[in-house]
Amino acid sequence: MACKSPAGAPFEYRIADINLHVLGRKELTLAEKEMPGLMVLRERYSASKPLKGVRISGSLHMTVQTAVLIETLTALGADVRWASCNIFSTQDTAAAAIVVGPTGTPEKPAGIPVFAWKGETLPEYWENTYRALTWPDGQGPQQVVDDGGDATLLISKGFEFETAGAVPEPTEADNLEYRCVLATLKQVFNQDKNHWHTVAAGMNGVSEETTTGVHRLYQLEKEGKLLFPAINVNDAVTKSKFDNIYGCRHSLIDGINRASDVMIGGKTALVMGYGDVGKGCAQSLRGQGARVIITEVDPICALQAVMEGYQVRRIEEVVKDVDIFVTCTGNCDIISVDMMAQMKDKAIVGNIGHFDNEIDTDGLMKYPGIKHIPIKPEYDMWEFPDGHAILLLAEGRLLNLGCATGHPSFVMSMSFTNQTLAQLDLYEKRGNLEMKVYTLPKHLDEEVVRLHLGSLDVHLTKLTQKQADYINVPVEGPYKSDAYRY
């Protein structure tokens, strides 16, 4: 249940407990030490404030690391409002610290409006997303920091239904989440039938954090429905090859261990999907001594897995033998309820893809005779009529954020440095970008890495002019073509 801002507060907020701000500020201060890229950007731009007055909405996990990103954007002058992009991923200490701010108190907060707490319901989640997109005077954002595309979805669907002249009845939706989306949009439509058209017209663009959200953006572009320019942060090398691999390598195990407290060594683990996230997950499980099997549809990724020493099988072939299941495909219907009915007793089932549709949790809840036995928050046992049970992590949502605290600060510093650079780019080029999805240029990728090497005591070799001429690159880079695959 959220704590709402009291009457007379300097701004609106909805968080779990504002009195958690002291611990949150301590966590934030420690995280800053591990996030050199963001701290350099603060030092570089805080005097000139290139984002002064720019309204930025965030829909991204409200963690300690995100708190450092938020305070970087505000240091650059932005007017920020924030919601989480997952009902379980908020760290309530971080949310409180951001509301209170570095110089405020619970009685007189001096931070920014946050609408997020751990354990939101779906109606609360979509209301919070709307609040993060709406300023007190009714204006919308000029720019969005998105993770998974929910903020972009709300604007795009709102625009679509305003154009059609009506919002479909929520009862027509085939799942609970979309019913909540429609209910939120219907409420807005009844108040202002042109709201989302006004918001879209004022948008400079969006920067998208994750694979699933990027897929949504490219689909909108393909259909001619992209309402504003977008920057694909996910496919920056310094995001996908670090956050997705090494972040998941760290946080997957953290989530499984905190929830289950079982010995992973010696057990059989099935990683479903061998993209960048799957690669990190497979490394982490093997590092704990698990016997790792991969499922894949892509022959290239499958061969990569085999060359790393993993077996590649179909789930149907191994479902009865696996102890730990991890989905990380970014797709839907990966583990069906019929598959869960065949799993061994007390098999652990979790997801580290962005949305909760990789595991058929709806089908699980509706299975005839199923018993739900909560173990602890975000860790539930589901017992089938035959007596065997599975252990579900975070209700099929992101287990690393639902059961733990997500990726560590250092790797998120690279992702969020990219996000900050993308926000600067959107504002600098406002009005000059097409309605398409852009990627960050290679020289910025390399610059992001350079900002982080010093803290790891890395000493780069420097090309001579002769060497640079020989391979036809500048002495200071960039060193690889856009087609190069790291």
From Swiss-Prot:
A single MF term (Gene Ontology): adenosylhomocysteinase activity
Gene3D superfamilies: Adenosylhomocysteinase-like, NAD(P)-binding Rossmann-like Domain
CDD domains assigned to the protein according to its UniProt record, in alphabetical order: SAHH
Cofactor annotation remark: Binds 1 NAD(+) per subunit.
EC number: 3.13.2.1
Catalyzed chemical reaction(s): S-adenosyl-L-homocysteine + H2O = L-homocysteine + adenosine
InterPro entries: Adenosylhomocyst_ase-like_sf, Adenosylhomocysteinase-like, Ado_hCys_hydrolase_NAD-bd, NAD(P)-bd_dom_sf, S-Ado-L-homoCys_hydrolase_CS
Example of a GO biological process term: S-adenosylmethionine cycle
Enzyme category, top tier: hydrolase
Binding site for substrate: 63, 147, 209, 239, 243
Record-listed NAD(+) binding positions: 210-212, 244, 273-278, 296, 331, 352-354, 400
Keywords: Hydrolase, NAD, One-carbon metabolism
Needed cofactors: NAD(+)
SMART domains in UniProt: AdoHcyase, AdoHcyase_NAD
Family under the similarity heading: Belongs to the adenosylhomocysteinase family.
Purpose: Adenosylhomocysteine is a competitive inhibitor of S-adenosyl-L-methionine-dependent methyl transferase reactions; therefore adenosylhomocysteinase may play a key role in the control of methylations via regulation of the intracellular concentration of adenosylhomocysteine.
PANTHER family: ADENOSYLHOMOCYSTEINASE
Protein name: Adenosylhomocysteinase
UniProt organism field: Trichomonas vaginalis
Lineage of the species this protein comes from: Eukaryota, Metamonada, Parabasalia, Trichomonadida, Trichomonadidae
